Amino acid sequence: VSVDDLEFVKTHQPIRSEEGLATWYTAAKGRKSANGQVFSDHSLTAAHRTLPMGSLIVVTNLTSGQSAAMRITDRGPFVGDKLLDLTIASAKATGVYRVGTARVRLDVYRTPKPIDSGGRWCVQVGAFTSHHKAEKLKEQLLHKYPGANVIEFPGDDSFWVRIRPEGDNREKAELIARRLRPAEGEAFLTRLD
């Protein structure tokens, strides 16, 4: 987070807010975050299931009032109904580190691209090298999301399982992504157009 980012936060209103649970995580040395950068416990960054990579956010611990600006650089959390995974530095800055989990408000101040509610969206929940495993997840999801169209995309070496919400609507896709359990796949939004 740069000095310019901190100045931007001071002089602008958030474009979107969410409340939920945050926890912290760490990763093996050398592991890359979803944005392609090497993960660092010392960076003020976080993981979110659907916000665009590079989004500038402020996380406020609703119990302690501590807050910090950070960037979205990774995908997650994929455990339970948590909203954010924080690096150790972010967790310490917001008072989440010692307690492990805390209720937070996430304020989005800037995204690399506007959060576009238009267009056609779906939720990708799995990528497999095995067609059988992709079919198994597809069948499991069809039982829970009968109104959604679950499709497979054969790639060079994988099959992708996606849930298409009614009308390919972004808000409906975000709702599905937030409700998916970890056993149902690691959900993230992707555009169809």
Regions found by a protein language model. Name each.
Residues 1-122, 127-139, 179, 191-193:
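Secreted/periplasmic proteins
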Residues 129-193:
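Extracytoplasmic
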